Design a protein with these regions (language model features):
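Short, flexible catalytic-loop segment of classical short-chain dehydrogenase/reductase
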Residues: 36, 57-68
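Residue(s) in the substrate-gating loop at a strand-loop-helix junction
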Residues: 15
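Active-site loop immediately N-terminal to the catalytic Tyr-X3-Lys motif
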Residues: 7, 20-26, 48, 86, ...
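Active-site helix of classical SDR
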Residues: 6, 31, 39
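Alpha-helical segment proximal to the catalytic Tyr-Lys
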Residues: 3, 44-48, 107
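Catalytic Tyr-x(3-8)-Lys segment
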Residues: 73-93
Length: 123
């Protein structure tokens, strides 16, 4: 992008666990916290080139990968108890945040983490 003189947006998919910690998720949380720091630093490094860098931090999203976990009542109840809006995310929720960050509507947004978490990190 720099060599071509292209201004734009880099969007990294992180996790709500990049904002908070999670029991029995030490390595996962560490990797997502690293992504948050990396993205903030890259936002500063690339700003002079007109390149914005942000992250999208979703909560649990209903996918083929998460369906088996959500089938376990105890796990699902725990997850839902942490989400004030009362439901897990959908892939469209994440896609909408990415679309916003990729568009000119976010031309003043860089170094930010867009939390698509139903309020998990507000608790």
């Amino acid at each position: 992008m720099i060599e071509s003189g292209i201004r734009g947006s880099i969007i990294n998919i992180s996790s709500q666990m990049g904002i908070v910690g999670g029991k029995k998720r030490t390595v996962y949380c560490a990797s997502k916290h690293a992504m948050e720091g990396f993205s903030k630093s890259m936002a500063l490094d690339l700003a002079e080139n007109g390149i914005r860098v942000n992250t999208v931090c979703p909560t649990f999203v209903e996918t083929e990968l998460t369906r088996p976990f959500m089938a376990e009542k105890e796990f699902k109840d725990y997850v839902l108890s942490r989400i004030p809006l009362g439901h897990v995310g959908q892939t469209e929720d994440v896609a909408d945040a990415v679309l916003f960050l990729a568009s000119d509507m976010s031309k003043m947004v860089t170094g930010s983490a867009i939390k698509v978490d139903g309020g998990w990190t507000a608790i």
